[in-house]
Design a protein with these regions (language model features):
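Polytopic alpha-helical membrane proteins, predominantly small-molecule transporters/carriers
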Residues: 1-114
């Protein structure tokens, strides 16, 4: 796995961070809300920067693949965080479609490596 893929995965995790930060900010007020909004700003900045870096250099990931994988990692992480942190429901169909995202990310990584 190249450094670009590692950067992309970390960027996707920061995408989860900015989505969770927004969710937490919605459920707080005052000074605590501002801390969550600051976490959002930092997370979104790092996420976008790492996505940008993953698409450059000698081992550049194609933009379409990078964006799809980045978004999927963020979506998967956000669903898992929502279940754990916000007590969102765990249903068969939710887990089924989440697993299709995981399979798609793996497939994109495989075909982009060739």
């Amino acid at each position: 796995m190249s450094i670009n893929w590692i950067l992309l995965i970390i960027g996707g995790l920061f995408e989860t961070g900015f989505a969770v930060s927004l969710g937490k900010a919605q459920h707080t007020s005052g000074k605590e809300q501002w801390w969550w909004l600051a976490a959002f700003a930092i997370s979104v900045s790092l996420s976008m920067y790492l996505l940008f870096k993953a698409m450059g250099g000698d081992k550049a990931i194609p933009v379409g693949t990078a964006y799809a994988v980045w978004g999927a990692i963020g979506a998967i992480g956000t669903v898992i965080a929502g279940i754990i942190l916000f007590k969102e429901p765990v249903t068969f169909w939710r887990m089924f479609f989440l697993s299709t995202l995981v399979i798609s990310v793996i497939g994109l990584q495989i075909v982009s490596s060739k």
